[in-house]
Every structure is written in C-alpha cells, then in structure tokens.
C-alpha cells in the first residue's frame, strides 16, 4: 500500500502565475512519475495526492481521471493556478503511465460485456495508420477579421478520455479561413489504440452521428459527428485528406498482423543467431582459458626448477662460509694454546732463576738482567695475548654479524618467494574466476537460473580472493620495509669496509671510479713534445678533461639494442666531437682512459658526475662483493696474527 505525500506549506501558501503553470505541471508530473507522490493504492483503487482532506479517499481509475480533469480545467476563481497545474499533471500521469495497467486491472466480466470491436470488424478493410479518428461539425465563431475560431483540441481530448476512448491527441484543422470545424483524433499505434478507435467509431454510429449519418442529406446537422479514418477519407480532396496523407498510411488489420508476425519471426531468428554467437564466444573463451592454464603450468614448473637451483646455490655459499668461520675459530684456539704454553715456560724459567744461588756480583747482575728481560717479555706476551683476544673477539663478532645478516637475508628471500608464489596462485585463481565469470555472463543472458546462481557464487569467491590479495600486498610492503632496513645496514658495513681497506695493497681494495689515469697523458705528451714541460702540459690537459667529465651537459653516449635481447644499453658515442679531437690529437692511450672514466661515472654516479669509491677485485678487474671484502679482511688479519706469533 502506498502512502500519500502531502505538498509542503511553502507550496500551499505561495501561488504561481498562469504563465508558469506548464513549467510547474511538468515538475509535478516528474514527481509523480519518479514515485515521490503515490497515486495507486491497489490494482483498482487510486487516490488524489493533492486532495488529502477530501471525504472520498479512494477512487476508481475513471473517477480519479474525471476528478483531476475537472479541477485542472476548472474556470472557478476558487481554484489556484497551482492546484490546476498539479491536477493537469495528474491527468497526464494517469493517461500516459497508468492507463494500460488500469485497463488490465478492470474486471474481465466488464471487458467481455463491452465486447471486442477488433474481432467484429473487417480485417481486410484499409484504415489510416497510425490509427486516427475524424470529428466534424465542431462549433466555430466568426471573428471581426472574418476568420473562424473554435475551441482547442485539449478540451475535446479530455472529454473523449472520460468517455473511455483514450486518445493521445485531438488536433483541430486550420486553413487560411481559420478553424475548419473539423479535427483529427489520434490514438496509440498499438492494438489498444485500434480498439479505442473502433469504440470511438461505434459510439458515434450507435448515437446516429456516424459517417453515414453525416453524409445523409436530410437537413441541418446538430452536434458532433465522428468516425475512424478509412481509405476514402485518406484519398479525399479536402483538408482532412491532405492532413491524413501527411501523417499516415493506409493499412489493413491483416497486413499489420502479418507484419507483426514477420517482425516476431525476425526477432526469433536474431535471438537464435545471438545464442549461437554466444555459444561460439563461450567456446573460444574456454579454449583460451585452457591455453593460458597450460602456459601457467609450464611457468610454474620453470619457477620450481629455478627455485631449487637457487636453494642449492644458497646452501653451498652457507657451507663455505661456515667452513671458513670454523677454520678461523680453530686457528684462534691453536694460538691460545701456543701462548699459554709460552707463558708456562716463562714461569718455569723464572722459578728456576729465582732458585739459583749466585755467589758473585757479576752472576747476580746477570741474573737480575735475565729476570728483568723475562719480566719484560712476559709483560709483552700478556699485552699481545690481550690484543690478540680483543682482535679475535672483533673478528668473531664480524663473522657472526655476516652469518646472521646472510641468514636473515636468506629467510627474507624465502618469505618473499613464498609470498610471491601465494600471490601468483591467488592472482591465477582471480583470473580463472574472472574467466568463469565471463563464461557465466554469456550463459546468464539466456535466462538460466542455475547459471545466475553460479555467477553469484563466483562473485563471492572473487571478492574473497581479492581480499586475500590485498592482505598479501600489505604483508609484502612490510617485508619490503624490513628488507630496506637490512640493505641500509649492509650499506653501512660496506662503507666501513671501504674506509678500512683504502690504503691496503691487496687483490681486493678500493678503486676511485671515474678517476683519470695520469700515465697515458704523460706518455702522449712525451711523444708529442720534447722533454721540457711534459709533466706541466700533461697536468693541464688532465685537468681540462677532469672538468669535461664533471660537466653534466656533456653526455657522449648512445643507446644500442643488444642482440637476441629486447633491452637497450648505453655505449660510448664514437662520433662525439670532443672524443674524436682527443683521439686525433693525443692517440689511443688518453682516449681509452677518458672513455673508461666516462663508463665508470655513467655506471656508478651518472647524476652527480663526480668520483666515487667502490670495493674492487683488481685481479678479476670487476666490482668486489661484500663477501669478498670480508674474506680479504679475515685473510689479512690471519697474516698479521701469524707475523705476531713468529715475532
């Protein structure tokens, strides 16, 4: 049951002018059509939303239509313009939006009593389509200018609606003399419109005001005459025929029935073709899903192989590291035992010297000197042992930190890979669910209830998988932050190692990336000039090219595509003007030194264009890893330890 919505006090207190009635009526019609104002209480009961205080609260459809039309077309001053406009909007809403449903709700016994004019008429008779009626003998008056005037078609239309003919429009016909006294009554294009038109024709015929009555020459005619437009009206050489030919065609009921049957058959054929196309599309989607599943299985197998290989390499590195640490610990224990043995020997010797009896001064002096030397050696050995123990603890701590960092990095890699596998699996499930969803959507268009139910289940699963994917993304971000902190710690260790190894002359050391080598420039100057001022000239040229290297606007590189690969790399542009002049002037030595420095700067510090330091494996001529640097540090520590032991 719908509830009546009452207009606000602002709407009741304020009124509108007659020029604003159409705009206000359109607004009220949209409110009615949008459901803001309820009109229907039940299939056969209606209510006026603008008259809530009326004694009669429930109307039949025709009664409400008559009430709304009477108020809307009232000439009484008691009715405000707003009331008239709102009731006219109600008339429009009843006619255009509730007419069909109201006629369907009419009792079947009443419809049968009225009969069906379509069944009783000649189906081969040509009628004007869209269905139209003709009204003649409409009263007119003569104006001062001699032109005729008559009432508008809306009043006549409302009258016909109240009589149950339900026209969509009544259009008076005008010519140069004004109102012609005739009008065209337009009905809906469907079978209901034909039904109303035939009722219109039958009503006037029964009343003695049909077409035959109008054509009889039996004296003056009183009242309106009407009939449905037929072929003779359509072909007539008058204002009615001209208007009918402009707005309609001649068709029989049989032709329209056949045309409707053809359209229905064409619709069925199109639907069948659409079903076949949907089945074909569904088959293609299933085949595509099968191909993608096979490709995904291959990728998963490949990933599993790579993962196993990665695990084996990590285990091998860990075993080598543990073996190296164990070796350091064993050497440390060996040195401790050696120092302990030496200390005991010195104590025994001191005890022996103390027990000797020295009778002469020379022997006592010698004994005193020996005792002092032994005490000095013992003190030095104790200090060395303390230093050794301190160094051992630092090395052990460094090795333990390296082992712990590697284990943490290994665990993070395993977690990330496990998370990546889980994320890929969920993404695969999401893609498969989306593929199934596309298939089900095509199947759901055929109206299968089971398919619709399966689509709902897939929607629910898809939402759960997307929620799991969001949780994994959140966890992934947490792991990325932890990995960044670990990388920062490794970078700090790398910097500390660089500071320690700056002055070392070993295979693993520190190299200044982007620094020009002096020797090629000196050699080139010696070949080009005499021995005088060679070094000064070389320094000047060297400083000039160091300035060029720092210039960020100078970028003598070009991008080339690698063979059998899709990526591009930057290489030296040998067509650069400065480099060509350098090679032509000083030869290959300085040219190679400059290009090498350019490549190093472009690789290690392209934005800053200044010299940076890196751990370098001079033997292999490549960047050294942190593990190589730590290994070299431990080797140097062992050498220093052995030297101290030998001393």
Swiss-Prot record:
Region span, Disordered: 1-20, 101-123
GO molecular function annotations of the record: RNA binding
Composition bias type Acidic residues, residue spans: 9-20
Biological-process GO terms, alphabetical: gene silencing by siRNA-directed DNA methylation; regulation of double-strand break repair via homologous recombination; response to cadmium ion
Gene3D superfamilies per the UniProt record, alphabetical: XS domain
Phenotype upon gene inactivation: Late flowering phenotype and reduction of DNA methylation at RNA-directed DNA methylation (RdDM) target loci.
General function of this protein: Forms a complex with FDM1/IDNL1 and FDM2/IDNL2 that is required for RNA-directed DNA methylation (RdDM) and that functions at a downstream step of the RdDM pathway and downstream of small interfering RNA (siRNA) formation. Required for de novo DNA methylation, siRNA accumulation and siRNA-mediated maintenance methylation. Required for several post-transcriptional gene silencing pathways. Binds double-stranded RNAs (dsRNAs) with 5'-overhangs through its XS domain.
Name of the featured protein: Protein INVOLVED IN DE NOVO 2
Gene name of this polypeptide: IDN2
